[in-house]
């Protein structure tokens, strides 16, 4: 049996071993500190060197044995550490190594301190070199490392461990201002204990306003009266820095310690030594140092390192700390002690801060990146996964030159002025530089801060496959970032950027071409569709959860999130032009059966942090305001767009319209100038408003998407009417179940909203009479209850028209600018099983056409397995889901839609596809007549000519030739009028006070160009005052697209004709004596034909 004493000795021995291990260096695991390793040869001893003399200035040396750095050597060329070579720093103060490059590989090690023995003195490595033109590009085993580099290749080890303070960065707890903070009162009070922050250290105080340049540095001086959470500054401050939680949002400035014991820096000159393009944008020396680690390294740990004057603005892969193509660097990659970057500080970087390139499992914790060019914390290609970014601070991220997504718009147009097709490069291809660039969602972001970026704080992007050097590997292993859920996003903070958080877009993976002319690596549209199996787009959707974010003082938008199954919770947002916007698709969400949710969040319009004017950010209404429109751009807390969206358990606070400008400020609004769809299923509930003047705001803009803006208030917490819907204040929506809410300029209705798309499936055969297209919808056969849509901008000419409609109402659709398309598809959205509605389509002509109506699924009218043909009936009352009715008098086609299949609540269509109706129009008269039946279907009219001249005008009717009778050519019947526009010719319809001056809405005339031409004709009204016969000024018909064999409707507001009378005559006229049709030009014009001339009464 082993004696007790022997057991005790073994225990003590094991404890000693634990205390003497050096990371990854099994040969010396009984040594407490690296500089105590046996057999270390002192640099200062000439016997340590093969040449038996110390290295001299400008010499390159190979280190193949353990060397102890115990003196400051002269400036050296290249140090190669390999075989069993080690370069270990002696634990003494102020050692500096100045060298052009350090290359570590094949068993080589660079060691300053260890995990058990942090380096507590000042140590500096300065990488020297004058310019890109004079320095040699270094290589290891054929791998390029560039210039001014510490390179770690296969078999290499780098261990840099500095003694650090308890707190790397913290926050202010009281506001400081230049007016009250000076050399006599220059103490910062901070959130955490900072009594170990060294005197003389440099600190950063971040901006708490819209201008990131309000971030500023200072130095700590001795303070005998400071508490443990206070420091005294050397210099006065320049800007106001907020130091409290305001209205529930933490807007306190971050205060960070930039100085570390171990410093790696680049030697830089006073001027730019580079090509003209680089120097134009960066008129200073941007040729900094960099560290690159490649696959196969033994160990790589960076703990408490300061990196200054690092990165190279002109070359890819020359970044301060760069894990390059390393694969896994954690336990799964075979590392007992996984790689990490902790408590480091990068400042004054000419290219990025911390870069993870085709590397998985890296820990980046409690670091600082300040004043950097290009993305700061970066996942390069979109193949990087399982990396952890925790408690990092990034501040002042500037535009860079390397890739389009780094560049400003100006940089983009300078570097690549035109795309593949010769068109100017679009700014949207660029302008995406971000403090955190997250190109693959399967990574962790916890407790990070992005404080200031020229563009964006945190950007999640979703390319189809990884880009760059990882592209082929990504395809091989079927890695699709756009299908990958977010691994973890928790409690991140973004402020003082242009945009806070961006969740959208991707990088172009292919070279430019005719069909995709954008440059390689430019920003493109992409759709995020997270899946339970990210390798299979057909697997079930999987939610991506963003839990906790503080977002404030961003010039434009707090957060923009486009994608499928997105959950946002515990957000706190304040002082942004737009707090939060969800987006999905402009037509139908690409990710069906899912929605977007935000809940348990706070959005504040304007906090107590009023800011300080600087850098073209003016003071408006007593506070900084960067938003534009002379300070009047509306504030929107939550901006509704696309959908389907759900807001639940939200608090909106401090949305006030204050004097003297009374700027529009609303808790909830809609995307302005919107061309795209809005889901009829978007809902809000459990909403609380605190100090809010306007809960909802509808903009004045009336683009297609603006007109269909809507949401449903499920519980009445906003409208005081549960299960009500909000829509724009338009007659089209105003039913007996609606009431007007004046402060919102909105209608609140007890109606059920649905959507209908009218789609032109044959634009090639459509007889477009101009470049414009539109569809008019009319509700319940009342002509003034109409809305006109010009179509979604995803096709030219526009071919898809969206309408928001109410269940249990009737809708007709007309085509006022051209004949009804020969193939028309009606696509109902968000209808439920067994629901039905009847609608009308204007065909425009009743003779010489053939109609065919089909019920299809997803437009598959060419596939008989999914087609059901409808058949005509002879009465409106006999319409069913299997029949249609065509009214030959009005040329209106009436069809019933019946939804056979059920749909999930969030799906726009049933699971088996959208049930649609397809109308096919053929025959010799197809495409001959404008598809506008409004006058025939709803209006009462005063006709001047239709087959015959109205008897009121028979005695005075004048024209140069007689009426033509030709049923094959006439608009509707058998007769029409010819007109030969010469300098003196005209057609007159004269009567005696037969046309009332009130009660008429339109003048209409149908025109056939006889041949394709640009004929110009005008209309004049006759009237009399005191027996004097007078004429109005001519009203020129501005339609210049009359075509041969096409009848075009010209509809003129009667008010526009009357307004051409002399102003002093208008109020004297109670009736008119007729009108004339005249030539608008002095020269003779080709003949044209006229038909169905009438006035339409205002019903």
Curated annotation (Swiss-Prot):
Glycoprotein keyword on record = yes
**Keyword terms, alphabetized:** Glycoprotein, Glycosidase, Hydrolase, Signal
Ranges where the G8 domain occurs: 47-174
Give the matching Pfam families. Answer: CEMIP_beta-hel, CEMIP_X, G8
| InterPro entries with a match to the protein in the record | CEMIP/CEMIP2 (IPR052252), CEMIP_beta-hel_dom (IPR055401), CEMIP_X (IPR055400), G8_domain (IPR019316)
So which residues have sugars stuck on them?
A: 62, 137, 664, 764, 858
* Signal peptide feature range: 1-24
Annotated transmembrane regions: none
Q: Name one GO molecular function term.
A: hydrolase activity, acting on glycosyl bonds
Claim: Hydrolase is one of the keywords in the record = yes
By sequence similarity, the record places it as follows: Belongs to the CEMIP family.
In Swiss-Prot or TrEMBL terms, this protein is called Protein DDB_G0287365
Species, as recorded: Dictyostelium discoideum
User: Could you read off the lineage of the organism from its UniProt record?
Assistant: Eukaryota, Amoebozoa, Evosea, Eumycetozoa, Dictyostelia
